[in-house]
Amino acid sequence: MNLLAFDTSTEVMSIGVSRVVDGVPRQWLHTSAGGAQASASLIATVMDLLQQAGLTLAQLDAICFGAGPGAFTGLRTACAVAQGLAFGADVPVLPVDTLLALAEEARHAALPEVPLCRVTALLDARMDEMYAATYDFADGQWSEVQGSHLVRPEDLVVARGAQAVQVLAGNVFTVYADRLASAEQNATTRITALPTAAALLRLAPGLLAAGKAVTAAEALPLYIRDKVAKTTAERMAEKAAAHAAAAQ
């Protein structure tokens, strides 16, 4: 399966391409500063990784992006680029919850041999709040226990499951250290992690098989807080993606 994935929902921009070469799965990955810088370099880096992998946009089975929740500008940039590239190449789009990608990254990095676990994924949402969601991992599959929502650190409730391993994962443990003490009492471990393109690439085959892909026109960011206006950078990223797809 030929896949392109990227996430710009946090302060880190993560991009990846995967394909099978001579029967062996291979990945090309890139990580750099995200935030406001993502719109300036995302498309160029995507095209460079595709070239390294020997793929064109039209040869992709899907374009995956971190749909949210996360930083507004990053979410809109990722969605606009995914739409622009997919429109020109007639490729389906796979929006993936960034908190699910975070949970998968934490599990894969720190608990690869653990067959059963419950992960509460947490991203700093600023304004004294966190984005949170809880997932169970069993039999190689993820299932949602509690969907993405906003919560104050001291109000976070970690629901205990039957799993022996209960994980808190995310980027909130320094900024909200004292205020997470109650939640951490119900966790067996905590893992500092962010959503990554590698996690998106691992999740994509199962999500595609489950029919989660959409057309470019149907792709949307997942907001927990409301925001309406597009920034100039977001509009420029959308146009640049369309031009890049048309040039191939």
What spans do the regions from the language model cover?
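N-terminal beta-alpha supersecondary unit
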Residues: 1-67
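Phosphate-handling active-site elements
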Residues: 51-59, 86-96, 113-114
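Acyltransferase
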Residues: 190-248
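DPxDG-like acidic metal-binding loop motif
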Residues: 64-92, 98
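Residues at secondary-structure transition points
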Residues: 33-41, 72, 76, 80, ...
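Surface "functional belts" at beta-alpha junctions
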Residues: 21-22, 37, 92-195, 228-229
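Conserved hydrophobic/aromatic positions in well-ordered beta-strands
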Residues: 4, 16-18, 131-135, 222
